[in-house]
Amino acid sequence: MHPFQWCNGCFCGLGLVSTNKSCSMPPISFQDLPLNIYMVIFGTGIFVFMLSLIFCCYFISKLRNQAQSERYGYKEVVLKGDAKKLQLYGQTCAVCLEDFKGKDELGVLPCQHAFHRKCLVKWLEVRCVCPMCNKPIAGPTETSQSIGILLDELV
């Protein structure tokens, strides 16, 4: 690309240069684009790639958490508005014998018994049943190895 030719072409198009000689804009091909155009295209591509990567990571973590709760029947809640629905205010964790307080992280089992999340994890390391009613947490086909995987994911 010849910058003087390009500038003369612009000036001719604006009527700033005498028109006694033939003055026209040279055709611009993809190879003649300035370097900053390449940087804009490359930067936009990187930006879109990073947004896609962030979205995929967020979506995968949501799916992993959803699959974990469906697979093991263990639901994790924070004691806020859900506590009124589960009627947990003033109740005691059967593992540590402490009352539930605001913003406590709770684990709710399929039998609707709630415990502190840390207490439940410690309990599941020893026994794979509900501390209140002794119902099994995992289905009959689940092995103790899958419960170990559950404990690894919770911690």
Curated annotation (Swiss-Prot):
What GO terms in the biological process aspect are recorded for it? negative regulation of mitochondrial membrane potential; positive regulation of apoptotic process; proteasome-mediated ubiquitin-dependent protein catabolic process; protein autoubiquitination
Which residues belong to zinc fingers classed as RING-type? 93-134
Q: Name one GO molecular function term.
A: zinc ion binding
Where in or outside the cell it occurs: the entry states: Golgi apparatus; Endoplasmic reticulum; Membrane
Q: Does the keyword Ion transport apply?
A: no
Kindly list the residue ranges recorded as spanning the membrane: 40-60
Read off the PROSITE patterns from this record. Answer: ZF_RING_2
Task: Quote the cellular component terms of the Gene Ontology held in the record.
Answer: cytoplasm; endoplasmic reticulum; Golgi apparatus; membrane
Zinc-finger in keyword set: yes
Keyword list, A-Z: Endoplasmic reticulum, Golgi apparatus, Membrane, Metal-binding, Transmembrane, Transmembrane helix, Zinc, Zinc-finger
Question: What's the main place this protein lives?
Answer: Golgi
The record's listing under Pfam families reads: zf-RING_2
According to its record, how does it sit in the membrane?
A: Single-pass membrane protein
What the protein does?
May induce necrosis and apoptosis. May play a role in cell viability.
Q: What is this protein called?
A: RING finger protein 122
